[in-house]
Amino acid sequence: MNPFRWSFRAQFLLGFLACAGLLAYAIYVQLHLGLEPCPLCIFQRIAFAALAMFFLLGALHGPRAAAGRKVYGVLSFIAAGVGMGIAARHVWVQIRPKDMMSSCGPPLSFLSETMGPFEVFRTVLTGTGDCGNIDWRFLGLSMPMWSMVWFVGLALWALYAGFKARRSSVHH
């Protein structure tokens, strides 16, 4: 079973299942291992959820026209690209010298109650405190680094599935 030969629907369903699995693991780590997500982690979860939504919509719709598949591929790529940007920022915060760290500021719940959405987004992306802590590693990579790997892989998968030439199922 070569996933590169699967139908568009099956390929996008696989993308959705990957995102759902990653989100489920993030929730497991939070609830059972006790690691509280920082604001950048939460934004990465939102990006994975958006990516999962586009993968699921594409899988359910399963457009026959190449243009429709390309639209889903591009939308998924954009969601993954946003996630890559957030993960890259998080990795940068984690690898910079500790003496350059500043306060992360108040929790995300407080920010969302006292600021508009764009100001919250800007504040979170400039904050660095808790976001700089590395509490979890697997094969030497922190969770934001793994998020980056997954965002890149899923972005490429979305483009492959969306732009792959497909044989017509209509026989002449």
From Swiss-Prot:
Q: Where are the transmembrane segments?
A: 12-28, 47-63, 71-88, 146-164
What is the first-listed, main subcellular location in coarse terms?
membrane
Tell me the residue ranges located in the Periplasmic compartment per UniProt.
29-46, 89-145
Record InterPro entries? DiS_bond_form_DsbB/BdbC (IPR003752), Disulphide_bond_form_DsbB (IPR022920), DsbB (IPR050183), DsbB-like_sf (IPR023380)
Task: Enumerate the Cytoplasmic topological stretches.
Answer: 1-11, 64-70, 165-172
Q: How does the protein's chain sit in the membrane according to the entry?
A: Multi-pass membrane protein
Single Gene Ontology BP annotation: protein folding
Question: Does this UniProt record's set of keywords contain Coiled coil?
Answer: no
The cysteines covalently paired via disulfide bonds are C38-C41, C104-C131
GO molecular function terms noted in the UniProt entry: electron transfer activity; protein-disulfide reductase activity
Stretches of the chain forming a coiled coil according to its record:
none
Q: What does this protein do?
A: Required for disulfide bond formation in some periplasmic proteins. Acts by oxidizing the DsbA protein.
- Name of this protein: Disulfide bond formation protein B
Q: Which gene encodes it?
A: dsbB
